[in-house]
Design a protein with these regions (language model features):
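Hydrophobic beta-strand positions in blades of beta-propellers and related beta-sheet-rich domains
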Residues: 1, 41-44, 80-84, 131
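Aromatic (tryptophan-biased) beta-strands that constitute blades/sheets of beta-rich domains
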Residues: 1-21, 48-63, 87-97, 102, ...
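Repeat-blade elements of multi-bladed beta-propeller folds
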Residues: 11, 15, 19-42, 59-81, ...
Length: 146
């Protein structure tokens, strides 16, 4: 409670990653969007702590990077740069020629999605190691998250 400082709720969850992972997958951080607290792979009502069953985010592929967010999407590494469309609850791969860095490396800002170069020197085999900026272009193609 912001006026009293009292704890309003607590919650525990299985984040579906083994303890002591070897590639950062155990270090994912929460994201707040409007009245939702998203703690991968689940989401909660920020005011009550009630689990929102419609959210059950499952990254496909390698997912060591931390999430970032806009008002309508989550962004993260799922092998490649990936967008999770909150309204549709669908994944959309942004590109397949690169991978974002292992920290918060996909920045939605001003209608663009920016991915600063953060993979050079990595042993992953992706062709493009450069900073990129993406503009919206029509209806995105999506894939199921289940």
């Amino acid at each position: 409670d912001s006026s009293s400082g009292n704890l309003l709720w607590t919650q525990t969850q299985d984040n579906r990653n083994r303890p002591g992972g070897d590639h950062g997958e155990q270090d994912h951080h929460p994201v707040v969007i409007d009245d939702k607290l998203i703690i991968e792979p689940l989401a909660y009502d920020l005011a009550t702590g009630k689990r929102l069953p419609e959210y059950d985010l499952r990254r496909h592929g390698h997912g060591c990077g931390t999430m970032s967010a806009s008002a309508s999407s989550l962004y993260f590494r799922a092998t490649n740069p990936t967008e999770y469309l909150l309204g549709e609850r669908k994944l959309r791969r942004i590109t397949t020629v690169s991978r974002p860095g292992c920290w918060i490396n996909i920045i939605p800002a001003g209608g663009l999605v920016l991915i600063p170069e953060a993979s050079s020197g990595c042993t992953c085999d992706f062709a493009v190691q450069a900073s990129m900026a993406f503009l919206p272009s029509g209806k995105p193609q999506t894939e199921s998250t289940k």
